[in-house]
């Protein structure tokens, strides 16, 4: 049986760790509410701009590069959205695993993969394994803002517009105006974690560009119109300026909003994952303290029993010695 002093030291150590995990759990819980509110607040705008883009795509004859796959595409950019901090359970591991699966699939299809990362954990993960990262942005995983993610969004859109035959500027948040010249790419994929519920967060791989799978460019007969959410036909819409001009102007904004929405989802998922991990750690610490306390009590009881036995034995020995005299 372990020494009583060692057991008490372990109990103190576990209780100290438990205070940390409990504090982290409470902090993560408070952040989830804020992150969820931001995700929900972005939904009305997302819904409306998606409707507008569908109408524009249906009314426009514009062959925009963002709406179609490039023939003979050579390079694909993969943005891996990780966290800046740890203690989030399997949050980052699941993202890295999904990214590896996507990269393997792209390489099998003949693409050269260009990896980009957000979050310190992603930077450290790939650096430790000696895997190249073309660019990284950090410092906003828990609470992303439109301004902080500006360079990420601008770089990916500029790189796609340049294509693998052209060049764009890599913007790292420090040299936004100048930037570093890099080769463009023909596809943009994002690997992030989707917030489904407090208990479920799932790593997803999403093709950001081209956005052909997102916007249906089928022609809609004018007489049929488009049905709204209630199933009623919506009124005809006239575009001013023309649909082609509006589509070309709004596509970059649509892509930027889509990417920013993924950052918001990832932030909520990160807080939920950290809260679950810290709650599990706190519960495990509580159970461990209970077990150690039981063992310590048994050790203490055994120690007391031994001391009593020694006292009784000593008294008996003294008694026997007196009788013999």
Swiss-Prot record:
GO cellular-component terms in the record?
plasma membrane; proton-transporting ATP synthase complex
Q: Where in the cell is it found?
A: Cell membrane
Q: Which residues form a coiled coil?
A: none
Q: Which organism is it from?
A: Corynebacterium diphtheriae (strain ATCC 700971 / NCTC 13129 / Biotype gravis)
What is the protein's given name?
Answer: ATP synthase gamma chain
The record, for InterPro entries, names: ATP_synth_F1_ATPase_gsu, ATP_synth_F1_gsu, ATP_synth_F1_gsu_CS
- Matching HAMAP family: ATP_synth_gamma_bact
Subunit composition and interactions: F-type ATPases have 2 components, CF(1) - the catalytic core - and CF(0) - the membrane proton channel. CF(1) has five subunits: alpha(3), beta(3), gamma(1), delta(1), epsilon(1). CF(0) has three main subunits: a, b and c.
Q: Name one Pfam family in it.
A: ATP-synt
